[in-house]
Amino acid sequence: MKILYVEHDDDNLYMLKTRLERCGDFEVLAAEDSEQGCKLAVTERPDVILLDLEMPVEDRWEPVRTLKKDLRTRNIPIIGMSVYAEASEREKAMATGCDEFDAKPIEFDNLLTTVRRVLAKPK
């Protein structure tokens, strides 16, 4: 399975990418900003996108909207991740187009369960 991980923090990117790849089930593509992430989503067609919702862009929800508007990427599930753990953040993420939401700091086992659940859903 192919995962696209969009994360602006190099340490977080390396750590989570490495842990996911060690599971043996995943090929992990990395993007350091939302523009690169959206382009990779179109060209690589990952099975799921892990998207940092705290990217340094004017509108942090724009990458989600962009991916869900594009016919080539609209059906790729997005797991939004944010340091804001309030219910309102989850609700906003889901309303904007995320299929799942995970609060940071990431609990790896919980995220892995979420990724596998999303990948198991019929398309």
Spans of model-derived segments:
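Active-site beta3 strand of CheY-like receiver
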Residues: E44-D52
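Receiver (REC) domain active-site loop signature in two-component systems and cognate sites
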Residues: M55
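Helix N-cap/capping motif at the beta->alpha junctions
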Residues: H8, A30-K39, R60-E62
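C-terminal output helix
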Residues: I106-V115
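Alpha4 helix (beta4-alpha4-beta5 surface) of REC/receiver domains from two-component response regulators
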Residues: K17, E62, A85-D102, T113
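Short amphipathic alpha-helix used as the core "switch/output" element in two-component signaling
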Residues: K39, W61-R74
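Two-component/phosphorelay signaling modules centered on CheY-like receiver
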Residues: D10-L29
